[in-house]
Amino acid sequence: MLRLLLLPLFLFTLSMCMGQTFQYSRGWTNGKRSFNAASPLLANGHLHRGSELGLTDLYDLQDWSSDRRLERCLSQLQRSLIARNCVPGSDFNANRVDPDPENSVHPRLSNINGENVLYSSANIPNRHRQSNELLEELSAAGGASAEPNVFGKH
């Protein structure tokens, strides 16, 4: 009696182990089996040929089209940026006369901030004067008391 019960149980266990080994030998994991549940139907029952034929990739068509759109958009953006930067009139320093062309290799690079209004060395006293004028206006208006030491440090 025990032999009749153990024999089917042993055969069932053996068949399950063989089936599991077959699935893992074909590269199936739990995530792949649950994600591609319809792939055996598309492969006409040939479970191992689905990945060889590329039929599992049919589910990624929407991803491919969106990837293509993103790549196309990126290439158009790159082309527009390159075209904008390569316009002949975009170099604002090209028409400027160099004061000492023989002393420096690239005079434009020696004074990068010379043409920038905020960071030019010529405007530093003006900025200090403007901050002092603001301090005087604040103290004359009787607003919030600002310490002169704070403005003097800048």
UniProtKB/Swiss-Prot annotation:
It comes from the Eukaryota. InterPro entries: Procorazonin (IPR020190). The keyword Cell division does not apply. Keywords: Amidation, Cleavage on pair of basic residues, Neuropeptide, Pyrrolidone carboxylic acid, Secreted, Signal. The keyword Secreted applies. Expression is restricted to 24 neurons in the larval CNS (8 in the brain and 16 in the ventral nerve cord) and 12-16 neurons in the pars lateralis of the adult brain. Residues 70-154 form a propeptide. One of its GO terms (cellular component) is extracellular region. Cardioactive peptide. Corazonin is probably involved in the physiological regulation of the heart beat. Clock (Clk) and cycle (cyc) proteins negatively regulate Crz transcription in a cell-specific manner. This is Pro-corazonin. The lineage of its organism: Eukaryota, Metazoa, Ecdysozoa, Arthropoda, Hexapoda.
